[in-house]
Amino acid sequence: MQQSTVVPVDMKVLMNHIYEYKKGVRRMVLFTFNKQYEDVAIRRLESQNIKYVIQPVGSDRLNLYFGREECLNAIRMIATRPLNLLTPEEDFMLGAMLGYDICAQCERYCERKDRKGS
């Protein structure tokens, strides 16, 4: 009888992100996942020579950015605190870098600026 290995959803999502990155669909990825998979995620990226930056999110989750070195250099300067504390400008830049819909990013930026009264 063949024994099947169950791959956690977090790891399936990571593998899909890596696939898209390697195919050129994305230049940078932000993946938020349970801290228990940190070693597996890092081993997977390092085995494929993919650069990354990792940041804690609360006590049990991590933000894993990976992709092109020039993008990660910018991330190291922009994402220096929790994402919900980014300025509207930093939030906009991060969304654009991640390839989010630019019109939606513009709308989000304007809403955040209006909320801050800036």
Regions found by a protein language model. Give the residues of each.
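Domain-length accessory/inserted modules outside core catalytic folds
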Residues: 1-118
